[in-house]
């Protein structure tokens, strides 16, 4: 509902003032403010659990605020559904894309509001209007293509174009670059700036500090459900924002490297996967106590390497040698028995059982080892190991019976890492281990990785964040179109060299 009362000064498109929201036993928002100007990109920052999502859901009509006022274009609003917000010019591009994969691009653009000709959908008009929006935003996608055939970055562009089609004045973007390459990120930023030029106010949520400083004009910081500050980006430093977010100063973004790589424990030679398109002739060594990064653009087949090592993908050629003995991992169970562990890229879909408790999620990869002599599960040992995961991984939780889906992304990731450590691996492979995790929790994950390397684990990390690879690894293997284009020493390499190698075989 849009009220005609309480006009705004006109300086802001959106003014959220004194917003309060409580859930049973929890005050999620405590007198929070957010003001967004036209022609601006406004960063909304805070650790996971700071209240960002709750605030935006109150704006978008998904939650009803307990008190406070929301002014949009000078009028007080009180939306009761996302549909109402969309129809009035507020749109949200979610981190989890809301597209129907089996339908065409233009079907997804106009779902629920198809243009009609008589009793039928006007396919020609739908195509023309979709194409016109794509042309204006420099999006090169066939409106008739099936969404399921597109890349994640292309799907992201469709979501933004969809918001554009509603003539949105406020566009909320939640971690829009989490699955994009640097080239795709730059294209996305071009589109976002076009929206800004048209007078839109963009609310931009990201844990990537470099993006915030590259793109945004102002920043609002929340902490523990409270408004901390709203300031122009021009007068801030990265350290100042981090201090506002976490309530303390983080003296460094990455832990000191104390690991000393030792002898070679893993030798991979000419590894080629069976599934096409595949990795081809991949060769590298991994040393005891070494952190080896894998860099590359989306489509470079970085994930294929660790999935082939872990037995998820079948290899067609090449050898894997562990401690001088040639092995074959035909499936995940064999890989686990050989001392491999894999923290997968998609934490929500393949990493956790969101509706089950921390205990189950901690033990599932090692559950066979908890059977006693008569075949029953040893509950005492299971409880003890779950508590070990919570304590050693420094998981913030009320207890082991807590549903893991209720934890922050950083704490979920700690449980997953702890789960694999219970299998006592020698080789720990982590695919995008800090994706969607706030800056404070990232540092804790980096500390855990550094501690494991110091204890002699061989660690392989895939990351799309260049500062992360340069900050925590010893060497970086660069992939390009399924081929190794180089292996560089982290101490002496540069971001430009890595990007050059990543483009070598395109």
Swiss-Prot record:
Transmembrane segments: none annotated. ATP binds at residues 46-53. SUPFAM superfamilies: P-loop containing nucleoside triphosphate hydrolases. GO terms for molecular function: ATP binding; ATP hydrolysis activity. InterPro entries: AAA+_ATPase, ABC_carbohydrate_import_ATPase, ABC_transporter-like_ATP-bd, ABC_transporter-like_CS, P-loop_NTPase. Residues 14-249, 264-506 form the ABC transporter domain. Keywords: ATP-binding, Cell inner membrane, Cell membrane, Membrane, Nucleotide-binding, Repeat, Sugar transport, Translocase, Transport. CDD domains: ABC_Carb_Monos_I (cd03216), ABC_Carb_Monos_II (cd03215). One of its GO terms (cellular component) is plasma membrane. Belongs to the ABC transporter superfamily. Galactose/methyl galactoside importer (TC 3.A.1.2.3) family. The complex is composed of one ATP-binding protein (MglA), two transmembrane proteins (MglC) and a solute-binding protein (MglB). Part of the ABC transporter complex MglABC involved in galactose/methyl galactoside import. Responsible for energy coupling to the transport system. This is Galactose/methyl galactoside import ATP-binding protein MglA. It comes from Shigella flexneri serotype 5b (strain 8401).
